[in-house]
Swiss-Prot record:
Belongs to the UPF0758 family. GO terms for molecular function: metal ion binding; metallopeptidase activity. This is UPF0758 protein CV_3079. InterPro entries: MPN, RadC_JAB, RuvA_2-like, UPF0758, UPF0758_CS, UPF0758_N. PANTHER family: DNA REPAIR PROTEIN RADC, UPF0758 PROTEIN YEES-RELATED.
Length: 224
């Protein structure tokens, strides 16, 4: 059955406009993005099938172009649209972080990091440089590694922190495996960086281990 024949209150676009985006499930939101279905399958049903085939919404968003465009109803144009939407959301979060206290909204920082590095296929180490008021100065991707590890040099992190005249840092790296549990090596690195930064009176506020669907906080675990 085509969506046009549904009661108006059940159509995804009309439902969003009248009740707000938060009231829609993943399939309905994805259907709005898809706009149309394929022969014999409306957009909502196509969205359901895609979510089932990819396994989750985060997996769909993290899919590389070859896997994405191999699915019926998807292609390079949809992939470009999706990447553009993701980048717009990341930039909007970056603007908000520059205007406010980064610690006042930990979820905002989490969302930014998930959008920035959560879907990367290799480990990427990011440093968020903050002022004395915890305002964003800059975000830099400092190191990149392999599928399972990245080498991080505390001296380079310290050098960049001093160059930015940062008073505090938040560090983060992704786990391409999709498992956000910190490793023992992650904890050792965090302790090493914290001690190095303390020598020049710079605070290490948090370390996030990031995947497409989650960002695990060292501070919330009491490890900082």
């Amino acid at each position: 059955m085509s969506i046009a024949s549904w009661p108006e209150s059940e159509r995804p676009r009309e439902k969003l406009l009248s009740q707000g985006a938060a009231t829609l499930n993943d399939s309905e939101l994805l259907a709005i993005f898809l706009r149309t279905g394929i022969k014999g399958v409306n957009a909502v049903e196509l969205a359901r099938r895609l979510l089932q085939e990819f396994g989750s919404l985060s997996a769909l968003l993290a899919a590389p172009l070859p896997a994405f465009k191999a699915k019926p109803g998807l292609g390079e144009a949809k992939y470009a649209q999706l990447m553009a939407c993701t980048e717009l959301a990341r930039r909007a979060l970056s603007e908000q972080m520059r205007l406010g206290d980064a610690l006042s909204s930990p979820q905002q920082v989490r969302d930014y990091l998930r959008l920035s590095i959560g879907r990367r296929e290799v480990e990427t180490f990011v440093v968020i440089f903050l002022s004395a008021q915890n305002r964003l100065i800059e975000v830099e991707e400092v190191f990149k590694g392999t599928l399972t590890e990245t080498r991080v040099y505390p001296r380079e992190v310290l050098r960049r922190a001093l160059r930015h005249n940062a008073a505090a840092l938040i560090i983060a790296h992704n786990h391409p495996s999709g498992v956000s549990e910190p490793s023992s090596a992650d904890r050792v690195l965090t302790d090493t960086l914290k001690r190095a930064l303390e020598l020049v009176d710079i605070r290490l506020l948090d370390h996030f281990v990031v995947t497409g669907g989650h960002a695990e906080s060292f501070a919330e675990r009491g490890w900082l």
